[in-house]
């Protein structure tokens, strides 16, 4: 393994951490409803737990309403049941053709709570970035121990990995701040 491979590993994994945090952020409720809220929901489709998005279309018809149109009408009851079991804070409204989810406007307490969740997701991502830094630094130490790089190269490599870490932690902080503002905006 060379230093370039260590750098590549570090960047790739830190970028994956950012992507994972973005996916997590998508499930958080903000002022307007997002279809990502129902992504984790699984519907019993002929005995197989299937993502809701694969048994029907999910559309945000306005800022507070999601409309779920199943591709098979016989799935309406199953979708309704799955939504109730998912405990996402709303009751499904089944009109025989589609299921509508009406999300009430969030209270300031709810907004603060969700903002806290966003902050926690950011902290989780920062821990992941720091763990990647540790793994990369361990790889650099091993290269030095195996006499594949000099002590000076090792020091520079550690500094470079720290620079990546600082950059990604700053990205995470910026994303959390932006998400908090989005959540708290009335």
Curated annotation (Swiss-Prot):
<comment type="function">
    <text>Responsible for the release of ribosomes from messenger RNA at the termination of protein biosynthesis. May increase the efficiency of translation by recycling ribosomes from one round of translation to another.</text>
</comment>
<dbReference type="GO" id="GO:0002184">
    <property type="term" value="P:cytoplasmic translational termination"/>
</dbReference>
<keyword id="KW-0648">Protein biosynthesis</keyword>
<protein>
    <recommendedName>
        <fullName>Ribosome-recycling factor</fullName>
    </recommendedName>
</protein>
<dbReference type="InterPro" id="IPR023584">
    <property type="entry name" value="Ribosome_recyc_fac_dom"/>
</dbReference>
<keyword id="KW-0963">Cytoplasm</keyword>
<dbReference type="Pfam" id="PF01765">
    <property type="entry name" value="RRF"/>
</dbReference>
<comment type="similarity">
    <text>Belongs to the RRF family.</text>
</comment>
<dbReference type="InterPro" id="IPR002661">
    <property type="entry name" value="Ribosome_recyc_fac"/>
</dbReference>
<dbReference type="InterPro" id="IPR036191">
    <property type="entry name" value="RRF_sf"/>
</dbReference>
<dbReference type="GO" id="GO:0043023">
    <property type="term" value="F:ribosomal large subunit binding"/>
</dbReference>
<dbReference type="GO" id="GO:0005829">
    <property type="term" value="C:cytosol"/>
</dbReference>
